[in-house]
Amino acid sequence: MYKYLDKVNSPKNIKNMSIEEMDLLAKDIRKFLVKSVSKTGGHLASNLGVVELTLALHKVFDSPKDKIVWDVGHQSYVHKIVTGRKDCFVSLRQFNGLSGFPKENESPHDIFDTGHSSTSISIATGIACARDIKKENYSVISVIGDGSITGGMALEALNQLGYIDTNMIVILNDNEMSIDKNVGGMSKYLSSIIRNSTVEKMTDEVDKILNVTQTGEILSKTAHRFKDKLMYSFSPQDCSFFDSLGIRYYGPIDGHNTKELIDILRKAKHKKGPVLLHVITKKGKGYRFAEEQPDKYHGVSKFDIKTGVTSAKVKSMSISVGEKLVDMANSNENIVAITAAMPSGTGLNLFESAYPKRYYDVGIAEQHATGFAAGLAKNGMKPYFAVYSSFLQRAYDQVIHDVCITKKPVTFLIDRAGLVGNDGETHHGMFDLSYLNSIPNIVVMAPKDTREMELMMDLSLKLDCPLAIRYPRGSSYYLDKGEYGEIVLGKYEVLDDGQDTVILCIGSMVKHALEAKEILSREGINPTIVNARFLKPIDEGMLKALLKNHKNVVTIEDNIVTGGFGSRINKFIIDNEYNVNILNIAIPEEFVKHGNIDELYDFVGLSPKSIADKIRKLVIE
């Protein structure tokens, strides 16, 4: 089916390929990626942009002896294809299938598990230093995007790397995008290198002087070949930032010119000390729809190749949050919105359009975003920081130090709480209830559905304290169960009365609990269902009344079992010496693999059927 790709099952297969053959292989790979991802979904645009770069890396270096560390890792599909996993792409990001990120247990060519941004330079530096201590001889390469290099961890790593002067290569894959358009001073700086390169200016002047006559065309081509050579030379005027750190800069380099890439990688391989190669790529290259809308094809569901159309989408929880925040801001000039490089993913692109002067995209910088929000709150603003649960982990100290100790009224809109599905371990939001539970002075809420989420956002305006609202990935939904009036701080809601057994559930697990009750009621088991709404504070009055009339207490949460909602209820029961049977249903204390969300709920025991089975066993015993 693919003339050149079908011959590749190992990096060894491309070692003797000519440049022309590698370019034809690149075309095959792009066709394969578009066809494959159209059937499974996945990260498309970023992988289309790194085809030539990945092939050049595997031609010049000897993986896995030479260590290639992929930042974030969503752009590692071509690497997986070259290292013998092409036939596994039918199961990409599916349960027990091929991961969308590097996995050490999947291939020896995957040097390190990654998933979050800005980590690769630190990891690669550690590998390089260990190599030096052991007096081993191999290359270490970090591949990082221009969005990721703005992250604090990446800058910290560059600071050390230049100082210790070890042999290492950093490849800066610059496509001017992270997921959305890049922002910030570093992004401007990198763009200025591209725009203002001394060599580019020189060749432009050559073109003008020669006026592109027939003779001029020949001389101009010669000048451009000369330019290509000079591109590899260090330019102190343009690249003083990297130079000042002690890291030698080469670039900008055409990331789609296979020969240029191979030449510069071979030179960098033998350079002493740290080297940074600034490679310019086009996100989505080779597929028109992805080139035109790279943000839409960053992470994409199944789509039609001919039209680029994905399956119809209903409104997401994130969009509902964005719409509600805009509505609140219409009548409150103090509301400001903050994102850490995820405006579309969090729904804040809507706020940006409505109130650009009250909207801040701080880049991949969750720590800074949290401290920044605290400063805004200090000076009278009402900041809302919308952030994925797994990314808020990076700002744990700032949540404590800058927000909660000082009781600043910052609201965290925690998106992607609970299991998220196909992205796996690094992206599940399964720890936030636990890590927020341990922090004083913060109110933590989780709505049963979209309408209750909006009511919780209304409540946030009335409270002058740190506050978090967590909600799941996926479509907006309405349970039409219970009351939808004004929410009172710390008050639970009884959705269904029953006897003997009470189920205390929070957030999206309310829906699962109600479905589990439908199963149990057919067997004569009739538990009381309580929508707890709050991790903290707890509704002590309702809990005392419930514990007097029920002998079995079940808690359900889409969070790790240790330290979260169940643990808080357990403590109340123990402290008040109630004699009841307790069952905590939650995510087991282990990292959860990737897969379809319903398969994962069943896998961890949080599907309605699994919940019903556990409660049945408790009641019968």
UniProtKB/Swiss-Prot annotation:
Cofactor note: Binds 1 Mg(2+) ion per subunit.
A GO MF label: magnesium ion binding
Catalytic activity: D-glyceraldehyde 3-phosphate + pyruvate + H(+) = 1-deoxy-D-xylulose 5-phosphate + CO2
UniProt-listed PROSITE patterns: TRANSKETOLASE_1, TRANSKETOLASE_2
Cofactor field: Mg(2+); thiamine diphosphate
UniProt pathway annotation: Metabolic intermediate biosynthesis; 1-deoxy-D-xylulose 5-phosphate biosynthesis; 1-deoxy-D-xylulose 5-phosphate from D-glyceraldehyde 3-phosphate and pyruvate: step 1/1
Recorded GO CC terms: cytosol
A biological-process GO annotation: thiamine biosynthetic process
Pfam families: DXP_synthase_N, Transket_pyr, Transketolase_C
Residues involved in thiamine diphosphate binding: H74, G115, H116, S117, G147, S148, N175, Y287, E366
Entry keyword annotation includes Protein biosynthesis: no
Keywords on record: Isoprene biosynthesis, Magnesium, Metal-binding, Thiamine biosynthesis, Thiamine pyrophosphate, Transferase
Superkingdom of origin organism: Bacteria
Function (record text): Catalyzes the acyloin condensation reaction between C atoms 2 and 3 of pyruvate and glyceraldehyde 3-phosphate to yield 1-deoxy-D-xylulose-5-phosphate (DXP).
Subunit annotation: Homodimer.
Family: Belongs to the transketolase family. DXPS subfamily.
The protein, known as: 1-deoxy-D-xylulose-5-phosphate synthase
Organism: Clostridioides difficile (strain 630)
Primary gene name: dxs
